[in-house]
């Protein structure tokens, strides 16, 4: 195998999906610890001490203890190159998370074993199922009193509609948690408390019978019965079913104590797929093609206050990036030279010399790159499936200093290009209406406008509950519609015509009266 193909085969690009507070940031930190990317793990709980989780780098995230934006971390493990996309943990940032899932080849689902499958996990799994993304599952927090593990497997199978194949099994839980038993290698790993900040060589015992004294006779007998039950009732691991997205290998542990994470990572790097082929409008692109192709799935403004710029997160789908190369921007039809692409480590930026399929690199963006843009080495090719969602909450932006209107408009449009909020300019007023999927984005925008654009604003209620993008192939009918409904119409930050409805009934009536007009809740970037 050539060096080029070896490099592609090494890549594993994935995201972690979970409900907020299931332990995603903690497990991210432990993975970085195993990949030698950090020397000590700072947990989210240690925020008051000034130790902040490495992946939560934006100021507001540090204050609130949530992962607002997606950061990308690359590190080596088990002879693989891991590209970990850390996704927003807070429920208000689901749109960003959705788009991140378009850039990965597999996903790690973290379940809080105390609470079981939660709402946010269900939504994210639905996104993964659209693309048959392979899923590995980690049942977290077994050092607490959790739900029954068999019950947890049942819940995952019934609610998320995916078969579970337990790879190991917990021995007790809470204060009686003694470790895990490897169902495939007949090996017990014993748990000890107090090793969460380091890589600790937990004691392993080969053969279940040899661990009887270490775990105690009662737990041993319970474990024997449970193992018989699990082997009879659950699915065996099948690699093909996993790769097709029909079955998930399940690992048990506690990320806070760094227990069970290594076993999960070993399984993940062994079974998760290398970069996969990608669908474009024109054809399917294979990862091992020689020419560079890829797409932008995220834009982040002002990642570094020292550099007032924007970075476009670019997923390489095929070929090799080399410093200084020229690439073709499909949407604009122009050539671009990339002299200073970046690689990331949660806010630490360094220039990257080369990149292969599966890698995420940062392109400096001075306003010409948008989410969903495709780049090639000359071929006219656009990758599919990077959506924009209609916001669900709307507010009117009120400017404290009327002389700063230009700066406000610029700031709102630039921040909306990152995809967490959307800005609308109504036809018949000078208002600016901000829309978002959740309430928290409004706080984030106000704070970032103040710190990055020196604009202070507040919000007022606005008579809008729903937004739909308007499309019509008949220009005359579209113009008639614009005249008739100008009181409800606006342009979004990208210039797309949008219908802002005060009520669901209003929207329904408008749709019924205008059958030739398409009212869409999503639009492709």
UniProtKB/Swiss-Prot annotation:
InterPro entries noted in UniProt? EF-G-like_DII, EFG_III/V, G_TR_CS, P-loop_NTPase, PrfC, RF3_C, RF3_dom_3_sf, RF3_GTP-bd
Domain tr-type G residues, every copy: 9-276
Q: Which UniProt key words apply to this protein?
A: Cytoplasm, GTP-binding, Nucleotide-binding, Protein biosynthesis
Please list the GO biological process terms of this entry: regulation of translational termination
PROSITE patterns linked: G_TR_1, G_TR_2
Among its keywords, does the record have Protein biosynthesis? yes
Q: What does this protein do?
A: Increases the formation of ribosomal termination complexes and stimulates activities of RF-1 and RF-2. It binds guanine nucleotides and has strong preference for UGA stop codons. It may interact directly with the ribosome. The stimulation of RF-1 and RF-2 is significantly reduced by GTP and GDP, but not by GMP.
Q: What is this protein called?
A: Peptide chain release factor 3
Q: Which gene encodes it?
A: prfC
